[in-house]
């Protein structure tokens, strides 16, 4: 079976962010882009800087360009700064919140949990990672899935890497459940991104 972590490690180094816990060690050991000449790359153009920032944000939510563009279109219609609204829009995705709650270890695992029908919202199965969670929605692992190993690990806090749960979530890992108390504030969302550069990319 091929090592599925290697492409993500290489992608992490190219984007300058660790996309998985395993990538953190590689990134710390080699904090430069992949390739023989990674350490001596030329200064990027303004366009490339904006493109890279957009790709960094996309990668942290593991979404397609089409999904990103749709989220940006919705963010433009929201009140306040478009960049902040974009990040909040992405953070309300079901797979993103499953990750933040500590039920999953990575965004990739969170997506699989949703796609495979292990997650329910307000008592009904939801298998779309892009499902937008609303304040007061209750998300939990379905009863039939709770005995599976990944969820047993989550129940014991095995995926909780920093001990901090975002303030917009109320989490009960023992019950494998959480509630979105309110819309997230951009400053509370743990993603690495200069969202203004992303806005400039789409507004070009």
Swiss-Prot record:
The keyword Repeat does not apply. SMART domains: Ribosomal_S4, S4. One of its GO terms (cellular component) is small ribosomal subunit. Gene3D superfamilies: Ribosomal Protein S4 Delta 41, Chain A, domain 1 (1.10.1050.10), RNA-binding S4 domain (3.10.290.10). Residues 92-156 form the S4 RNA-binding domain. GO terms for biological process: ribosomal small subunit biogenesis; translation. One of its GO terms (molecular function) is structural constituent of ribosome. Keywords: Ribonucleoprotein, Ribosomal protein, RNA-binding, rRNA-binding. It holds the Pfam family S4. InterPro entries: Ribosomal_uS4, Ribosomal_uS4_bac-type, Ribosomal_uS4_CS, Ribosomal_uS4_N, S4_RNA-bd, S4_RNA-bd_sf. NCBIfam families: PRK05327.1 (NF003717), rpsD_bact (TIGR01017). Part of the 30S ribosomal subunit. Contacts protein S5. The interaction surface between S4 and S5 is involved in control of translational fidelity. One of the primary rRNA binding proteins, it binds directly to 16S rRNA where it nucleates assembly of the body of the 30S subunit. PANTHER family: 30S 40S RIBOSOMAL PROTEIN, SMALL RIBOSOMAL SUBUNIT PROTEIN US4M. Belongs to the universal ribosomal protein uS4 family. This is Small ribosomal subunit protein uS4. It comes from Streptomyces griseus subsp. griseus (strain JCM 4626 / CBS 651.72 / NBRC 13350 / KCC S-0626 / ISP 5235). The lineage of its organism: Bacteria, Bacillati, Actinomycetota, Actinomycetes, Kitasatosporales. The gene is rpsD.
């Amino acid at each position: 079976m091929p090592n599925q972590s290697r492409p993500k490690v290489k992608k992490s180094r190219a984007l300058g962010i660790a996309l998985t816990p395993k990538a953190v060690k590689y990134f710390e050991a080699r904090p430069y882009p992949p390739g023989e000449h990674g350490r001596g790359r030329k200064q990027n153009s303004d366009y490339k800087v904006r493109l890279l920032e957009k790709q960094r944000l996309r990668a942290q939510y593991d979404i397609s360009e089409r999904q990103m563009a749709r989220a940006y279109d919705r963010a433009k219609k929201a009140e306040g700064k478009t960049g902040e609204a974009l990040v909040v829009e992405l953070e309300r995705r079901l797979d993103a919140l499953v990750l933040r709650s500590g039920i999953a270890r990575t965004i990739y695992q969170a997506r699989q949990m949703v796609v495979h029908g292990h997650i329910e919202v307000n008592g009904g199965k939801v298998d779309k990672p892009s499902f937008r969670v609303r304040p007061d929605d209750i998300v939990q692992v379905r009863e039939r899935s709770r005995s599976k190993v990944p969820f047993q690990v989550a129940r014991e806090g095995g995926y909780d890497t920093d001990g901090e749960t975002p303030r917009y979530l109320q989490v009960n890992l023992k019950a494998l459940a959480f509630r979105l108390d309110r819309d997230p504030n951009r400053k509370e969302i743990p993603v690495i991104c200069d969202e203004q550069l992303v806005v400039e990319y789409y507004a070009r």
